[in-house]
A protein has these predicted regions:
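Metal-dependent polysaccharide deacetylase catalytic core of the NodB/CE4 family, i.e.
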Residues: 31-44, 48, 90-92, 100-102, ...
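Short, electropositive alpha-helical surface patch
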Residues: 209-227
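A cross-kingdom marker for long, charged
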Residues: 233-264
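N-terminal pre-catalytic segment of deacetylase/amide-hydrolase enzymes
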Residues: 19-92, 249-254, 262-267
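Positively charged n-region of N-terminal signal peptides that target proteins for export
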Residues: 1-5
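Bacterial N-terminal signal peptides
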Residues: 8-16
Length: 267
């Protein structure tokens, strides 16, 4: 009788354990977050440092998918900061600088195919010039709604004139004039992008990465309504209490390998 009773308990335990999936029994560990910085995507072979071939770019997206790297946004990053907890698994934020026309012709279709979202930092003065995206294309992308009801393409500021923000300071005769220059670069670019996208612009990417962590530049960003500054400092986000005005990134260049991306995520 005792043996029969033990056998029944064993069968019940087995049935309970069989209902627990591997994911439930082994929750994912908190991972890292990497901000990937692209510029121009080209068909065929890349011919300079800041170009990436469409084939390599697509392989990057496949790498993210294959390694279950969640593509998130800067708003998600703010929620992580507020919660004080890193998300389970690794994450990536896709960003693009300047405004090359390849964003519309190459990047947009690939992101839609792989169901990924991205932030595009505009060099506002150059929009509509040769080889750059135009405002009509910016509007089309920013207003696009995916099948899940989300808008996957967000436009943000890379300044108005793409000037060095900190290194330009000695050229101004007074602090007041320098701050007026900063307000123009932050404010005018923000207002123009918002007028074409009907979306709040609160993310800024530093031209040339110049001025990362500088108090005056951060103050100018804040008074012009920004909540984030993406820098060009190489690194991954490993702590939820990140300085949102000094966000590191990883430039993706013509010869960057997916192994390098993986190394920042401990893969």
């Amino acid at each position: 009788m005792r043996t029969k009773h033990i056998l029944m308990i064993f069968i019940v335990l087995l049935s309970v354990l069989s209902c627990v999936s591997p994911e439930e029994s082994q929750p994912a560990e908190p991972g890292n977050i990497i901000v990937l910085m692209y510029h121009r995507i080209v068909n065929g072979k890349a011919t300079n440092l800041y170009e990436r071939s469409s084939e390599d770019f697509e392989n990057d997206l496949k790498f993210l998918k294959a390694n279950s790297i969640n593509v998130i946004t800067f708003n998600d990053l703010e929620r992580i900061f507020t919660s004080g907890q890193m998300p389970e698994g690794n994450s990536a934020i896709l960003t693009f600088d300047d405004g090359d026309h390849s964003w519309y012709s190459i990047v947009k279709p690939l992101l839609l195919e792989y169901k990924m979202k991205a932030t595009f930092f505009l060099w506002v003065y150059m929009i509509g010039h040769e080889s750059f995206i135009d405002w009509n294309e910016v509007e089309q992308m920013s207003h696009y709604v995916a099948d899940d009801g989300e808008k996957p393409f967000l436009f943000a500021s890379h300044s108005y004139s793409h000037s060095y923000l900190l290194d330009s300071k000695p050229g101004f005769p007074s602090e007041e004039e320098y701050n007026s220059f900063l307000d123009y670069e932050f404010g005018v670019s923000k207002n123009l992008i918002e007028s074409h996208t009907n979306t709040e612009v609160n993310i800024f990417a530093l031209p040339y990465g110049d001025g990362a962590g500088d108090p005056e530049i951060i103050a100018a960003a804040k008074r012009n309504g920004y909540k984030f500054i993406r820098t060009s400092k190489w690194g991954a986000i490993t702590d939820p209490q990140i300085n949102l005005f000094e966000i590191p990134s990883l430039p993706i260049l013509d010869n960057t390998t997916t192994d390098l991306i993986g190394s920042y995520l401990n893969l």
